[in-house]
UniProtKB/Swiss-Prot annotation:
This protein's encoding gene: gpsA
Organism, as annotated: Chlorobaculum tepidum (strain ATCC 49652 / DSM 12025 / NBRC 103806 / TLS)
Entry's transmembrane regions: none
UniProt keyword RNA-binding present: no
Pfam families reported in the protein's UniProt record: NAD_Gly3P_dh_C (PF07479), NAD_Gly3P_dh_N (PF01210)
Gene Ontology CC annotations of this record: cytosol
Name the record gives this protein: Glycerol-3-phosphate dehydrogenase [NAD(P)+]
Coiled coil (UniProt feature): none
EC class of the enzyme, as a word: oxidoreductase
Amino acid sequence: MKITVLGAGSWGTTLAMLLANKGHEVRLWAHRPEFARALEADRENKRYLKGVLFPDNLRVVENLHDAVETAEMIVTAVPSHALRETAAAFAHLPLDGKIIVNVAKGIEQHTGKRMSEVLLEALPRIAPEQIAVLYGPSHAEEVARQQPTTVVACSVSEATARRVQEAFHTSSFRVYVNTDLIGVEIAGSVKNVIAIAAGISDGLGFGDNAKAAIITRGLAEISRLSSKLGADPLTLSGLSGIGDLVVTCLSQHSRNRYVGEQIGKGRKLDEVIGEMSMVAEGVLTSKAVVKLAERLGVEMPISQAVYEMLYENKPAPQAILELMERDPKPEHY
C-alpha cells in the first residue's frame, strides 16, 4: 500500500518507519523543507529519534501535494493545533477512496471540536467513513525500538477501522478495532490534561496515593464528558481510555506529565514550554476542555484546576488544597 505520513516529529517518524518495515511504500512529509532534506540525507531523525535508521522504502519528501496525491492512506501526525491548516492545504486534491488516519490527540481550542470533526470541515469532499484515528498507550521511543505496544484503530466504519488495523498491525504493534469515535477521541485528548495534573503531583513531592486519586478521578471526568457527548462507557475501559491515561500519567516519556512536574516545582509555563523541542498537547487541550465542559454543564474539577494553574498562575499547592476541600460527594454522580 502507498502510505503518506504528514508530520516528521517523533510519532510521525516512528509510524513511517513501522509502516515501511511492514513493506508499505511510505513517504514522510516534513513541514520545513530544510528539515525534510536533512532527514533524507541522514536517513534518520537525529532530532527526535537519534540512532534509529530509516528503512530503504521510506522516502522523505518536501512536496505536500505529490505526497498526498499518490497515497492510498494518509496519516496525519502534525500537532492538533496545526491539523486544520495542514488538511486545508490539500483539500483541493482528489481524495476519493483514500483513508485519512489521524494520530494527533487534542481538541481544537477555538471550536471545541474533535480531530475527526476538524478533518471533515477542512476536507469537505470526504465522507465520515474515510476518517479513522489510531490512539492508545504508545510512546514513540518504545515503538521505534519495536517494544510491545497495543493501540486501537477507530472509525465510524468498521471496514475502515479494519483496513487501518491491517496496515499497521505487526508482531510488536498490536492493533484492535473500535467504532466509538467520540469515546476514543475524547479519552485520548483529555488524558493529556489529567497527565499534567499527575505531573504537578510529582512536582509537589506527593506520593502514590495522590497519583492514584488523580488517575481515578480524572477518568471519572473523562467519563462524564464523553457520556454527555454520546460515547460508549465501555470505551473508557479500553486502550484509548484507561490504557492511555495510565501510561501518560506515569511514563518518563510523557511530555504532559513533565510539564506538570515542572509547574509543580514552581516554574512558569512559558519557561517550561520554551525549552521543549516537542509539543505537550495537554497545555492547549486544557483550554478547550474547560470551555467544552462549561458549555455542556459537565463538572471537571481536575481539568479546571490544571487550567487555572497553567493560565491564571494559581499556585499549585492552593489548587490541590481547593480540590481536596470541595464538598463531599458520592463516588459516582
